[in-house]
Amino acid sequence: MIQVLLVTICLAVFPYQGSSIILESGNIDDYEVVYPRKVTALPKGAVQQKYEDTMQYEFKVNEEPVVLHLEKNKGLFSKDYSETHYSPDGREITTYPPVEDHCYYHGRIQNDADSTASISACNGLKGHFKLQGETYFIEPLKLPDSEAHAVFKYENVEKEDEAPKMCGVTETNWESDEPIKKLSQIMIPPEQQRYIELVIVADHRMYTKYDGDKTEISSKIYETANNLNEIYRHLKIHVVLIGLEMWSSGELSKVTLSADETLDSFGEWRERDLLQRKRHDNAQLLTGMIFNEKIEGRAYKESMCDPKRSVGIVRDHRTRPHLVANRMAHELGHNLGFHHDGDSCTCGANSCIMSATVSNEPSSRFSDCSLFQYSSDIIHNPFTSRCLYNEPSKTDIVSPSVCGNYYMEVGEDCDCGPPANCQNPCCDAATCRLTPGSQCADGLCCDQCRFMKKGTICRIARGDDLDDYCNGISAGCPRNPFHA
């Protein structure tokens, strides 16, 4: 059994609030200064990890005490995660860096069921958390010989440009004659967990913008992927970072002022080059290019799993990885088949993931329209989900298993999240074991905690291919042995 480490950090609020300061996130108009003080309660003889599996932070926001629970995002990297860059003469250089003891976390606020958190603990505490419906950011002040951090709201960040930005996908607004249920009434069915094995590519313009600092680029992409993973976990989609590319010697596909041309060329490169040497489900290009017509991103619609079209492009923002993650989540949503939100769509926040106009305000929520479309349509589409069931082996997701993180790992029968959030009657959230009498908790061949009858169609054929059928003895949907 894994020995869970309890780490308590008290953040003492500095006796004044700052009026203005320049941080990594930009110029901050108003902020609180806090000092993380770390107290570790380790069993006698235990060896402390560099980055603990579980941490707890206690601090005050607006003079109100909060308790922030953090858990290392063990599903962030695949076991065969690789990074590729290129020598000045264009030679491909691929490495397999150790990523087991990484420093990226997800979390929640105690006694706030709607709270979320995405934090990097690599060099101080950096990231964001949602408390009582409002998003706060924490970031080191980077003062000499000081552990001071700033806590601030996004509304206090000076904006580069207030003009609205656009997604390049058009003619895809939400339309439905069916009434949309309230957010609390829309349930994501307890189907089989889906996995998107993702490669993120930094183009040469982005590489140059960061002065060729590979460490900084990879850290930004790790942080982006951690945020992206946190956004999609609520749909039971596990985004696994399987590879990172840096086009260090020059662009490997056309990157122009036209988002459409850039997307087409990147898709062709992915099919011709990347797929031939790296297995993955989807690739996203992060670019330093500023596209025409204030376009921030572009993706093919309903294209997940397609060799050429399962791609998206997103403009990089050096100081705001949370916004990059929101925009990448948006384009990835189009790949899955999501429409843009209409005027009547809502998510309980000022901005939703699939809003047509790209907001400067970060959001981690899909709207009621998106959730309805996902639960009634996308989740059942065999064309855009066929590659998402080939889950990485439980041993392919690095680090030991932890019950309650939504990912079924070695030694678990199921994992429906923390007991307070679990809505699966087949799974005991406290133990990650099946409830008494249950044969299964999710899967295409699991219905009301029981295996579906042998011969039940679980995946409809595409084109001239064959349907897949349940075998009556497992929850998964086995591949038809007579497939072409």
UniProtKB/Swiss-Prot annotation:
It is found in: Secreted. GO terms for molecular function: metal ion binding; metalloendopeptidase activity; toxin activity. Expressed by the venom gland. Disulfide bonds join 305-387, 345-369, 347-352, 403-422, 414-432, 416-427, 426-449, 440-446, 445-470, 458-477. Gene3D superfamilies: Collagenase (Catalytic Domain), Disintegrin domain. Snake venom zinc metalloproteinase that inhibits ADP-induced human platelet aggregation (IC(50)=120 nM (native) and IC(50)=248 nM (recombinant)). May act by binding to the receptor GPIIb/GPIIIa (ITGA2B/ITGB3) on the platelet surface. Degrades the alpha-chain of fibrinogen completely and the beta-chain partially, leaving the gamma chain intact. Also inhibits the growth of several cell lines, including human liver cancer cells (Bel7402), human leukemia cells (K562) and human gastric carcinoma cells (BGC823). One of its GO terms (cellular component) is plasma membrane. Residues 1-20 form the signal peptide. Residues 21-191 form a propeptide. The modification Pyrrolidone carboxylic acid is found at residue 192. Binds 1 zinc ion per subunit. Its EC number is 3.4.24.-. Keywords: Calcium, Cell adhesion impairing toxin, Disulfide bond, Fibrinogenolytic toxin, Hemostasis impairing toxin, Hydrolase, Metal-binding, Metalloprotease, Platelet aggregation inhibiting toxin, Protease, Pyrrolidone carboxylic acid, Secreted, Signal, Toxin, Zinc, Zymogen. Ca(2+) 1 binds at residues 197, 281, 387, 390. It comes from Protobothrops jerdonii. Fibrinogenolytic activity is completely inhibited by EDTA, but not by PMSF. Zn(2+) binds at residues 330, 334, 340. One of its GO terms (biological process) is proteolysis. Negative results: does not show hemorrhagic activities after intradermal injection in mice. Does not show pro-coagulant and anti-coagulant activities. This is Zinc metalloproteinase-disintegrin jerdonitin.
